[in-house]
Swiss-Prot record:
<keyword id="KW-0445">Lipid transport</keyword>
<keyword id="KW-0732">Signal</keyword>
<dbReference type="InterPro" id="IPR003172">
    <property type="entry name" value="ML_dom"/>
</dbReference>
<comment type="subunit">
    <text>Monomer.</text>
</comment>
<feature type="signal peptide">
    <location>
        <begin position="1"/>
        <end position="19"/>
    </location>
</feature>
<comment type="function">
    <text>Catalyzes the intermembrane transfer of phosphatidylglycerol and phosphatidylinositol.</text>
</comment>
<dbReference type="GO" id="GO:0032934">
    <property type="term" value="F:sterol binding"/>
</dbReference>
<dbReference type="InterPro" id="IPR014756">
    <property type="entry name" value="Ig_E-set"/>
</dbReference>
<feature type="propeptide">
    <location>
        <begin position="20"/>
        <end position="35"/>
    </location>
</feature>
<dbReference type="InterPro" id="IPR033917">
    <property type="entry name" value="ML_PG-PI_TP"/>
</dbReference>
<dbReference type="GO" id="GO:0005576">
    <property type="term" value="C:extracellular region"/>
</dbReference>
<dbReference type="GO" id="GO:0031210">
    <property type="term" value="F:phosphatidylcholine binding"/>
</dbReference>
<keyword id="KW-0813">Transport</keyword>
<protein>
    <recommendedName>
        <fullName>Phosphatidylglycerol/phosphatidylinositol transfer protein</fullName>
    </recommendedName>
</protein>
<dbReference type="GO" id="GO:0001786">
    <property type="term" value="F:phosphatidylserine binding"/>
</dbReference>
<dbReference type="Pfam" id="PF02221">
    <property type="entry name" value="E1_DerP2_DerF2"/>
</dbReference>
<keyword id="KW-0964">Secreted</keyword>
Length: 169
């Protein structure tokens, strides 16, 4: 199954869960998880968990236009650093929602999806820059979309985890 190119690019680029322990009225405390930290750059992305142990260190992701608009060309530029080589067998767990309705929940071969952004496995350790232009169809139904992508190596080590929330078309 092929994913939409913009979603694939966002997945690969492509988590800081902030916790606090407020005092409780009942005399005990509970951890509160705040929204994820934003990914640097002009984009709607957030990390979905603490990224310090991730294989992909994302330096920046820039989208133009941001937010993406139906019927336009989406320009993507991302820069980062891979701390390990990514080989065949890597995968992405993807969920796309339209409002509260889940449109897609799938586990896909990351290497097969990388061809949509002109990359291929293996991805070598070191700095990476991705630039891509994607024509977005004008027929994208109006509404709010959410994308969650959790990306792993073939050995189940986390590459990255990203959320794009409340994308309005």
């Amino acid at each position: 199954m092929k994913l939409l190119s913009p979603a694939t690019a966002l997945l690969f680029l492509a988590p800081l869960a902030v916790t606090a322990t407020p005092a409780s009225f009942f005399g005990y405390t509970q951890d509160v998880i705040a929204e994820g930290a934003p990914v640097r750059g002009d984009n709607p992305l957030e990390y979905c968990s603490e990224p310090s142990g991730d294989i992909l260190e994302i330096n920046s992701v820039d989208l133009a236009p941001n937010p993406p608009k139906a019927g336009t060309t989406l320009k993507i530029r991302a820069a980062g650093n891979l701390h390990e080589r990514i080989e065949a067998g890597a995968y992405v767990v993807l969920e796309v929602k339209y409002g509260l309705i889940t449109l897609l929940r799938d586990t896909a071969d990351l290497c097969a999806q990388l061809t949509n952004v002109d990359l291929q496995c293996p991805l070598e350790e070191g700095p990476m820059v991705l630039t891509k232009e994607v024509d977005l169809p004008s027929q994208i139904p109006r509404g709010r979309y959410t994308v969650h992508a959790d990306v792993y190596t073939k050995d189940n080590k986390r590459i990255t985890c990203l959320d794009a929330k409340n994308i309005q078309f």
